[in-house]
Swiss-Prot record:
GO cellular component, as recorded: cytosolic large ribosomal subunit
Alphabetic keyword roster: Ribonucleoprotein, Ribosomal protein
Comp. bias regions, Basic residues: 1-28
InterPro entries (alphabetical): Ribosomal_bL35, Ribosomal_bL35-like, Ribosomal_bL35_CS, Ribosomal_bL35_sf
UniProt-listed GO biological process terms: translation
Name of the gene encoding the protein in the UniProt record: rpmI
Protein name, as recorded: Large ribosomal subunit protein bL35
Disordered, as annotated region: 1-50
Annotated family: Belongs to the bacterial ribosomal protein bL35 family.
Amino acid sequence: MPKMKTHRGSAKRFKRTGSGKLKRRHGFTSHMFANKSQKQKRKLRKSAMVSAGDFKRIRQMVAKMK
């Protein structure tokens, strides 16, 4: 059985925290900023954690990632 390869697209989008959780960026941040409020744009700048339901699936794709 061959080794599991790290999904390179996922490895570039997620970072592992010290406690083992996965950190991600918010969506809706590439264009159309005139239609978003200042509060919404400020909140989108911060990073977020991957939810528990998605974590199980993403963990397999980035298993070897540090």
